[in-house]
């Protein structure tokens, strides 16, 4: 399967649960190498939108093209290959396998692709970069929450993905580890030009990204409208 480069294009995306429309006609573009945050209050549809854009949850209607390929028109084999080669995922909870060591968890995507030996040295390099060199052979239950999340980020990066999709990657971390993760993602985007789309409710985190997309009740709104809605909500309290 041949891949081309052209970023992410979302057109009139909608998601309905029962009689409720959660995502309401979202259209947006993300260029190659961009670092974008999805912001908004809890329940605004941020995570739902991220999961649809990243191929994990099909929309009710609308189209999502990544590198000019309509991802929901791919067959199962194509989307599996696309995810494994071009996408990395980071979640609020790391979902690491406790029976394996840090390095074994990082190498899981390479193992699935049958490329374990080819990526061994790079996996070790990532853990060293993330200050985990002396813990790469530790099982996950011996790591702190911040260390485990760094392992999860290394796992997302090990196949050199073009796209990183992150859903509240600092949501379960203290302020010190939050800054570590923020700095790692900023460095990855700057040095490797990896396109990153991150969901966050943290304004400090969002301010570190190149661009913010503001969601209110499933709609993308301008910064001016977003600030006005926030101000109105505070006044109503």
Swiss-Prot record:
Describe its function: Part of the ABC transporter complex LolCDE involved in the translocation of mature outer membrane-directed lipoproteins, from the inner membrane to the periplasmic chaperone, LolA. Responsible for the formation of the LolA-lipoprotein complex in an ATP-dependent manner.
Q: Which UniProt keywords apply?
A: ATP-binding, Cell inner membrane, Cell membrane, Membrane, Nucleotide-binding, Translocase, Transport
Subunit structure of this chain's protein: The complex is composed of two ATP-binding proteins (LolD) and two transmembrane proteins (LolC and LolE).
This protein's encoding gene: lolD
Question: Where does this polypeptide localize?
Answer: Cell inner membrane
Top-rank EC class of the record's enzyme: translocase
GO cellular component entries: plasma membrane
SUPFAM superfamilies tied to this protein: P-loop containing nucleoside triphosphate hydrolases (SSF52540)
Record's bilayer topology term? Peripheral membrane protein
Q: In this protein, which residues make up the domain named ABC transporter? A: 8-237
CDD domains in the cross-refs? ABC_MJ0796_LolCDE_FtsE
Identify a single GO molecular function assigned to this protein. Answer: ATP binding
EC number annotated for this UniProt entry: 7.6.2.-
Family listed:
Belongs to the ABC transporter superfamily. Lipoprotein translocase (TC 3.A.1.125) family.
Provide the species name: Leptospira interrogans serogroup Icterohaemorrhagiae serovar copenhageni (strain Fiocruz L1-130)
Q: Which Gene3D superfamilies match?
A: P-loop containing nucleotide triphosphate hydrolases
Binding-site residues for ATP, renumbered to this chain: 40-47
Query: InterPro entries this protein is in?
Result: AAA+_ATPase, ABC_transporter-like_ATP-bd, ABC_transporter-like_CS, MacB-like_ATP-bd, P-loop_NTPase
Please identify the protein, giving its name as recorded.
Lipoprotein-releasing system ATP-binding protein LolD
